[in-house]
UniProtKB/Swiss-Prot annotation:
GO molecular function term, any single one: electron transporter, transferring electrons within the cyclic electron transport pathway of photosynthesis activity
Gene assigned in the entry: psbB
Pfam assignment, any one: PSII
Gene3D superfamilies: Photosystem II CP47 reaction center protein
Residue ranges the record marks as coiled coil: none
Name of the protein in question: Photosystem II CP47 reaction center protein
Length: 508
């Protein structure tokens, strides 16, 4: 036929058997990629430190998705939450990966079978003997089956009735684990951070899908609607399917970037807004304040801050700090976190406590400015020493650490004070190993950033694809150059697959 590359998919027009074949092959490729990627990630993943070197710091992409659905153990004897296990069972990370690869192989064979045996009786219209598909009926079948799967996931898997439950954590990502979830039927179910909404919405949407599927199986569309929406044309199916996919892609890009119960920070890393709003910093100060109210010393109060919470309050874990073309995991950027040095508290020679102004998300460099409790600038690291009034040396700034590895250690040497003031711009101070992975010191994004960018980009492309194919199917006769005043009744499109010039026509 000599088709140009952008028209090759016309070979499956008017050929239901091979249309099924290429879709099964597509499923084989997707499942095969997922299983292979899981095995690759398991080969390079280091589960030894779930606090300072979690999956999202290591750039894992498919492991978080398995984990949020209830997989936590490996045949290698480790658990994602730390510690060892002896009986991981079939549904370990490797078990899921293997199931995808086996499924991919079966789909590959099924695709070949359907390509060879394309001319099946089931695809033929018994009245004409020609291949045809009852698309409204197929829509009803698909709606019913997807509704069934949706209902089953919400009612059984998520609730733990027959399944493991899902990953649930506290608002600060400290206590996450897989557990069963009760459906939230009240207004709280609409809060995107309430896990119960996942169960209730799947049950509700699944029920609606089942009922809508049964409706479309039992009720035929009116003739005018059938013709108006071109329900007999497979390109209508393509257009509406693309619409469903791009809509879903936009939704998940939002839930990933802004955060929700479906994207826990323990699995995908914190969101940029948690840095922008000082979310973890406020919780840390609240806990320290509560400790001081119980007559604990500053050192005791800061020592009780979980290292995990302190690590979230570090700009290197902000997904918006990674550049668009900086490939690799976060560990390849600023290094592997080894330990929390503690919280630095700066004071001037008059004893005032000073706070380092933190770097906003979209800055690569930022002036080092120390302010007092009223927000008045008291010290800085000047650009021009000749005109400085507030330099660390002039103001006599000292620093003392509370909690962490340097607990109780203080420094008055200006060079050391300035070093820690610069590092305090980036949040809590951590010791980072940049030698092991030859990390270059340039921040990388987390899987949260990559997922969002990928899905938002493809959603935009698919949006244009929906418009393109929708317009093609609605205005096919116009695009084909058929004169609306034509006095011959043309059976258009029967042979568009092969471009057959012998289209039947009948003068009226």
């Amino acid at each position: 036929m000599g088709l140009p590359w952008y028209r090759v998919h016309t070979v499956v027009l008017n050929d239901p058997g091979r249309l099924i074949s290429v879709h099964i092959m597509h499923t084989a490729l997707v499942a095969g990629w997922a299983g292979s990627m899981a095995l690759y990630e398991l080969a390079v993943f280091d589960p030894s430190d779930p606090v300072l070197d979690p999956m999202w710091r290591q750039g894992m992409f498919v492991i978080p998705f398995m984990t949020r659905l209830g997989i936590t153990n490996s045949w290698g004897g480790w658990s994602i939450t730390g510690g060892t296990i002896t009986n991981p069972g079939i549904w370990s990370y490797e078990g899921v990966a293997g199931a995808h690869i086996v499924f991919s192989g079966l789909c590959f064979l099924a695709a070949i079978w359907h390509w060879v045996y394309w001319d099946l009786e089931i695809f033929c219209d018994e009245r004409t003997g020609k291949p045809s598909l009852d698309l409204p009926k197929i829509f009803g079948i698909h709606l019913f089956l997807s509704g069934l799967a949706c209902f089953g996931f919400g009612a059984f898997h998520v609730t733990g009735l027959y399944g493991p439950g899902i990953w649930v954590s506290d608002p600060y990502g400290l206590t996450g684990k897989v557990q069963s979830v009760n459906p939230a039927w009240g207004v709280e179910g609409f809060d995107p951070f309430v896990p119960g909404g996942i169960a209730s919405h799947h049950i509700a949407a699944g029920t609606l899908g089942i009922l809508a599927g049964l409706f479309h199986l039992s009720v035929r569309p009116p003739q005018r609607l059938y013709k108006g929406l071109r329900m007999g044309n497979i390109e209508t199916v393509l257009s509406s399917s693309i619409a469903a996919v791009f809509f879903a892609a936009f939704v998940v890009a939002g839930t990933m970037w802004y955060g929700s119960a479906t994207t826990p920070i323990e699995l995908f890393g914190p969101t940029r807004y948690q840095w922008d709003q000082g979310y973890f910093q406020q919780e840390i100060y609240r806990r320290v304040g509560a400790g001081l109210a119980e007559n604990q010393s500053l050192s005791e109060a800061w020592s009780k801050i979980p290292e995990k919470l302190a690590f979230y309050d570090y700009i290197g874990n902000n997904p918006a700090k990674g550049g668009l073309f900086r490939a690799g995991s976060m560990d390849n950027g600023d290094g592997i976190a080894v330990g929390w040095l503690g919280h630095p508290i700066f004071r001037d020679k008059e004893g005032r406590e000073l706070f380092v102004r933190r770097m906003p998300t979209f800055f690569e460099t930022f002036p080092v400015v120390l302010v007092d409790g009223d927000g008045i600038v008291r010290a800085d690291v000047p650009f021009r020493r000749a005109e400085s009034k507030y330099s660390v040396e002039q103001v006599g700034v000292t620093v003392e650490f509370y909690g962490g590895e340097l607990n109780g250690v203080s420094y008055s040497d200006p060079a050391t004070v300035k070093k820690y003031a610069r590092r305090a711009q980036l949040g809590e101070i951590f010791e980072l190993d940049r030698a092991t992975l030859k990390s270059d010191g340039v921040f990388r994004s987390s899987p949260r950033g990559w997922f969002t960018f990928g899905h938002a980009s493809f959603a935009l492309l698919f949006f244009f694809g929906h418009i393109w194919h929708g317009a093609r199917t609605l205005f096919r006769d116009v695009f084909a150059g058929i004169d609306p005043d034509l006095d011959a009744q043309v059976e258009f499109g029967t042979f568009q697959k092969l471009g057959d010039p012998t289209t039947r026509r009948q003068v009226v």
